[in-house]
Amino acid sequence: QGFAQADMILERDYTTQLIEHAYIEPEAAAAVPGPGGGVTVYGSIQNPFSCRRAVAGVLGLPLARVRIVQSHMGGSFGGKDEVMSAMCARAALGAQLTGRPVKIVNTREESLVESYKRHPYKMHYKIGVRRDGRITAMEVRMLADAGGYASQSLFVTWRSTVQATGPYVVENVKTDVYAAFTNNTYTGAMRGFGSPQAIFANESLMDEVALELGMDPVQLRMVNGFEGGSVTATGHKLDEHTVSLKEVVRKATEAAGWEAKRARLPVENQGRAKKRGIGMACSFRGCALGAEGVDAAAAIVSVQTDGSVLVFSGLAENGQGLKTIFSQIAATELGVTLDRVVFMETDTSTVPDSGPTVASRSTIMGGSAVRIAAQK
């Protein structure tokens, strides 16, 4: 029906490549045997509690006998999740068998060989639009290369489904996303988690549609963009918060001098081997796990006898400023200066499991837990 209503139908294919995280610090872990057959593991670990479950499973120990302490990380970007669980389990097994501390540090070559990458995608888009730019229908097919193991492919492709048609109102949508096992390097979580591939394809398509219609790419996005009360392609009604897409696009393009540069640059580029241009793209993204499951986090705020404050959270600092944010929240709620607040290192023996540090969830979920704990 949607394609029947269209004045123009366009089909395009897009591909994205395998990408390495390239964090500055390679994977590293140290395991120390403890009393009663237990073990303590220190490492550059993105998700200490999932790591604890992996180590306990390999060693055949109860969770209470396994302590994971997160060290300061030299980058992660989603890449130090299950890879680090495997490394920590190997170090812990070595410590258990020898009764001595064991340390493992990957070389850069070992890191490149062993770690998972961003999923390469092949994508086919079909879009129907009216002459005024209004989208009437979209059909999307995506194929992700999972490599030899499933890893996070199920959830990465789920996220691609959500993002496939961008921040635009499209009433008639069909999206199919698949992940295929191959003999390539396996793929998993990387910053954006299935969104960058879809955003690249959809925003490239929007530019091509604008070109075919002889329409300004900004205007095409303004015609179709989300606003308050809009319904996404997956049925999510945007009615419980401010939807500022069009305002952001308007202000960004005004600040960039969009119209003036669009008029000037083609003239300036005449006869030049190297040409200059101006482009724009839109996206939308939620915080926390969303429809992937019920989300929760916990925190402990302990006020000492001298009025200083200790803050404990099960969410791990990955370089995003978590320690500062949580400390600021506690200081604000308790009415103390920031220098009176100390954020304690993530240690599975002293803090509650608050789920993984993924999906831009730490500030909104962990920060809310710190705020509530401080209030109480």
Give residue spans per PLM region.
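Structural alpha/beta core scaffold segments of enzyme domains
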Residues: 1-376
